[in-house]
Amino acid sequence: MIERGKFRSLTLVNWNGFFARTFDLDELVTTLSGGNGAGKSTTMAAFVTALIPDLTLLHFRNTTEAGATSGSRDKGLHGKLRAGVCYSTLDVLNSRHQRVVVGVRLQQVAGRDRKVDIKPFVIQGLPTAVQPTELLTQTVGERQARVLSLQELKDRVEEMEGVQFKQFNSITDYHSLMFDLGVIPKRLRSSSDRSKFYRLIEASLYGGISSAITRSLRDYLLPENSGVRKAFQDMEAALRENRMTLEAIRVTQSDRDLFKHLISEATSYVAADYMRHANERRIHLDGALALRNDLLGSRKQLAAEQYRHVEMARELAEQSGAESDLETDYQAASDHLNLVQTAMRQQEKIERYEGDLEELTYRLEEQNEVVAEASEQQAENEARAEAAELEVDELKSQLADYQQALDVQQTRAIQYQQALQALDRARTLCQLPELTAENAEHWLDTFQAREQEATEALLMLEQKLSVADAAHGQFEQAYQLVGKIAGQVSRSEAWQCARELLRDWPSQQHLAERVQPLRMRLSELEQRLRSQQDAERLLQEFCKRHGQQYQPDELDALQQELEERLESLSQGVSDAGERRMEMRQELEQIQQRIRELTTRAPIWLAAQDALSQLGEQSGEALESSQQVTEYMQQLLERERETTVERDEVAAGKRAVEAQIERLSQPGGAEDQRLVTLAERFGGVLLSEIYDDVTIDDAPYFSALYGPSRHAIVVPDLSLVREMLEGLEDCPEDLYLIEGDPQSFDDSVFAVEEQDRAVLVKTAERQWRYSRYPAVPLFGRAARENRLEILHAEREKLAERYATLSFDVQKTQRSHQAFSRFIGNHLAVAFDADPEAEIRGLNTRRGEIERALNNHEAQNQQQRQQYDQAKEGISALNRLTPLVSLLNDETLQDRVEEIREELEEAQDAARHIQQHGVSLTKLEPLLSVLQSDPQQHEQLQQDYTQAQSVQRQAKQQAFALIEVVQRRAHFSYTDSAGMQNANNDLNDKLRQRLEHAEAERTRAREQLRQYQTQFTQYSQVLASLKSSYDAKRDMLKELSQELVDIGVQADANAEARARTRRDELHAGLSTNRARRNQLEKQLTFCEAEMDSLQKKLRKLERDYYQLREQVVTAKAGWCAVMRLVKDNGVERRLHRRELAYMDGDELRSMSDKALGALRLAVSDNEHLRDVLRLSEDPKRPERKIQFYIAVYQHLRERIRQDIIRTDDPVEAIEQMEIELGRLTEELTAREQKLAISSKSVANIIRKTIQREQNRIRMLNQGLQAVSFGQVKSVRLNVNVREAHATLLDVLSEQQEQHQDLFNSNRLTFSEALAKLYQRLNPQIDMGQRTPQTIGEELLDYRNYLELEVEVFRGSDGWLRAESGALSTGEAIGTGMSILVMVVQSWEEESRRLRGKDISPCRLLFLDEAARLDAKSIATLFELCDRLEMQLIIAAPENISPEKGTTYKLVRKVFQNHEHVHVVGLRGFANEPPVLGVTAAETP
């Protein structure tokens, strides 16, 4: 028997009146006796504070404050303490005989709020000899002690060996340890639990029927069916989780395509870009190598072109030089031809002009004579006309002057003055100072005679001059001819010079006749010389091209050698062409094969990927199609075996679940029909009565009752007899036992207990021997133990079933994968590696291309040699006929000799041609040159002088005529006399004027006639002179030009000059053609060089740029490769089949995937940001980071509880397998988890029945309790009507409300709340949610109503109320209720604490004096029967014969207040022992 724990003592340190006091507590009743203010309540307050150190609950008031809403300000604690550190400790000895000291350290906090600081602590393992006061205080003198602080206490305790000190910051931890050690009856998990415990202690302390407890009896007495409630909550949570899991699975299944899509598109997006960069890197590397090869080749080609350019430039310079010489020669020949043609034309013009000059000379002589005569006549007529004109003018002037002076004197004076002026002018001209108006007429006759004489003398001299001019003209002509031929010669040497010229004339004519033969001979020799020079030039060019000097005699042998070489080179070129054609054909075949393999490679790579995946899945090395088919057969066999094993495991799992379901029935009823029959018979299942049996006693009772362990206990078998008739729905064996279900025991059998077996004597002649079952199932503890085992077994079977299901589906998927592989890839999977063949073919192609390039270079060299040999033979064909000409060494001398003779002949011919006519004319005039007619100049001077005299005579005669005409004017001395004179003069003047005008008219007419005739003669003469002068000048110019031309104009000169020019033109054309060809070749070469240089610069720029790109890309590629390899995604990204797609296709693939990814990750901010960053084309590593982020995101989304891999791709494959299995399993689980409404009603009813039975058992313990007129106390338990209706509907009419319980949108609790509202529409549910109401309806306590009833006097059973009872009766009734609550708590908490722990029972009662002696005795009896401790307080001793009594007296000594305590132990059955303690020294 387990002993109940007991409180041994209470210690107060530094409380008001108690410095260090320990109260030993009695095992039953401890009484505190004393007057008012003695310290009884303080002692009890210290006990309660140590028991419940919660300042939010503690409120110590006296009985006068009962029912008050507020007490003292400090709630009764602050005033009970003294300044400094205070302690309140309880010394407990629990069922394990462990000494435990629990207590609190209290200290007042300064301030108006009068707060108290509390620190709970526990001391374990304290030796029995150590008293609490010794532990908490330190002696400092004989009668003085000091209270230790908490830290000092801790240090002191830790110094003790084996003693533990624990300080708590949480009241929950403090109470949890107290519950585990058996100090308090219930685990106080929360503040509400502490509040209940405190309210119980408070009700016990102040006594009476506590309304706070009676109103909440359900919470105090009825244990919370946390198991059932938790089962419902777990069921709902499991259903909710199951539905959420199913929904998540459905969402996951719907998201599976999204995951696949995300993986596929991310792989396409990143792998396409990854392979595009890999391809571009390979292309860039190949491009860089190709550019480098092109660069080197271009440099070599540029060097060759530069060498060729230098050679062609040198040859062009030579050709240009030769062309310049040829152009000079050609231009000279052309100029010579032009000069010859010009000379011929000049010669013709000279001859024509010489004839014209002879004719013009004759005509000019005749016309000179005619003009001379006409000139004389013209002079005479002019003089006559001039004189007539002067006379008319003078007369008119005189007449005008006279007319003007007719009326004025001035006019006469003017005329007179004019007459004087005319007289002076005449005197001046005639040099006659004595001339007067009277003798003017005389002198006029004289001077007119002089004029006549002068005119006659002039005519005579003119005739003489013309005769002298004829002789003088012949001499001059001859002199001019000599000067023209021989140059400047004196007139005296002219005859001698002319004779010498005429003497040399015949020899020069002979030389001139040899010009044409010499010219023809020279032309032939020059032509031959030019041919020799051309041949020498051709030979030099030939030697220069061949780099060797050859003699003309060696040309024949050289030609034969070149012809043989040309034949061999021609054969080599032909063979090279055939070889080149063969290599090109082979190259085309290789390229065609590479294209075919390139087309096949992606298909083969896809097949290899599929094959590698199959190899990874199977773990086999699949090397042939036969192995694939054999392994596929193995998969079929494995699938069959795994399916069989899975079905076996499923059957075992169903069997275990059936056992679990049977054992999970409430009350232990394995057959649900027994529950129905028990309700029908009004009995209780035997298993339900023994439901609380321990697991240790379960085998005994199971063997004791044997097959009847499933019997129904009924109050009266006779009442059941009639119900058994016609009973069909029942087990095969139905056991019925008569007995009271409330007080049933095992006395119905005679039993002998043996070693792990029992012998049951069911009758005198019938025994039953039953062994203890190996797996007992009798009692809730045994069933729960078995359920734990079955649950563990079910979990193992479920795990095994899940593994087998997964293996089956994995095998099926592997079989499907093999089937797809056989259908799609088997035909090509085991073919040879096309990439290896491509690499070999690429190597061979490179070799062929290099050989072809070398062959092209050799062929080009051979062709050049062939062309050189061909050109050499062509040059030799031109040089061979000229060998004799090249050997002629005297040709140049002969040409020079003939050229000198030709020059002499040409000089003679030019002299004859230039002066032949002059010599012909000079020959007859040679004799004229012997005498020089110098007197011709004297005659010319006389003629000029005669002309001057004749003109002067004419002027003098005219001046005298004017004076004679103005003689009348000299007489104007008198104006009167002058008037008459004027009239006469006017008439005369008019007559004279008329006569003069007539004379003038005749003179003018005659002058006009002679002028016209003279003009005509003069014009003819001028024309002849002009023509003569022009032709003479032209002849001089022509002769000078002919001399300047310096070419002998003959009949053959033009033909020779033209022939020479044509030859030079042909040579120049040939040279120009060659030069143009060289220029074109040079231009083409320069263009080729420029192109090569541009190409070279571009190649260098492109090469260095590409090389820089390659170097730059290498760093980025290294970063990409590090990311790829570090994260293990290279196998996913390096898809070799993508290497056969071009950049545009890969970019298009990546762009399409990017568009799909933007939609796929639009709801994921992280992936959306990473995707946006990955779009930077300059940062390819960000795409890898995005791919890694996608993988990481998917890894995080992998359900590790159902997926066994970290690879999202494999996870998706496993997900497809596992989700299907989980869907089936969870659907089945939901059907199993879904509890029926009838089962819920049965569970609640069974729980209500069990609690009713438990309350009846508690009532049995209170039947003998009596206080005053109260003879008995009991608890009445009733089911609420509305809740009873709900249970009836749940058990019998659930089909009518399946719309609530079959709804997936409602939990069971919500459906239950909806049904309660439907059944009770009149009840207001307030603001509570259906879930809250449903959870309350799942708590059986809400179905019950508890009332305390007392049997009092003649009134019978009455409801226990304070107003209907006396104070003592109320105190006793309240104490009974509290004892019942404590018992209920202990039973409720029995399974929560150790099996060897029985908790302490202690209650309080203040003001116990209100109870009579009988009631006090009842309390003592109750404490004895229930092993309960009780602390009571009263002003006077109460029943000192039992328990322990302390007498408390408060005293004041030297201003120090203390309590004097005297202890007395009960003396009912033993001698009284009186213990008195001395007063404390504060």
From Swiss-Prot:
GO terms for cellular component: cytoplasm; nucleoid. InterPro entries: MukB (IPR012090), MukB/SMC (IPR050308), MukB_hinge (IPR032520), MukB_hinge_sf (IPR042501), MukB_N_dom (IPR007406), P-loop_NTPase (IPR027417). One of its GO terms (biological process) is DNA replication. The keyword ATP-binding applies. ATP binds at residues 34-41. Its main location: cytoplasm. Gene3D superfamilies: 1.10.287.1490, 1.20.58.850, 3.40.1140.10, Immunoglobulin FC, subunit C (1.20.5.420), MukB, hinge domain (3.30.70.3500). Plays a central role in chromosome condensation, segregation and cell cycle progression. Functions as a homodimer, which is essential for chromosome partition. Involved in negative DNA supercoiling in vivo, and by this means organize and compact chromosomes. May achieve or facilitate chromosome segregation by condensation DNA from both sides of a centrally located replisome during cell division. Residues 666-783 are annotated as: Flexible hinge. Pfam families: MukB, MukB_hinge, SbcC_Walker_B. Homodimerization via its hinge domain. Binds to DNA via its C-terminal region. Interacts, and probably forms a ternary complex, with MukE and MukF via its C-terminal region. The complex formation is stimulated by calcium or magnesium. Interacts with tubulin-related protein FtsZ. Residues 337-468, 509-604, 780-805, 835-1044, 1070-1115, 1210-1265 form a coiled coil. GO terms for molecular function: ATP binding; DNA binding. It comes from the Bacteria. Belongs to the SMC family. MukB subfamily. It is found in: Cytoplasm, Nucleoid. The keyword ATP-binding applies. The hinge domain, which separates the large intramolecular coiled coil regions, allows the homodimerization, forming a V-shaped homodimer. This is Chromosome partition protein MukB. SUPFAM superfamilies: P-loop containing nucleoside triphosphate hydrolases. Keywords: ATP-binding, Cell cycle, Cell division, Chromosome partition, Coiled coil, Cytoplasm, DNA condensation, DNA-binding, Nucleotide-binding.
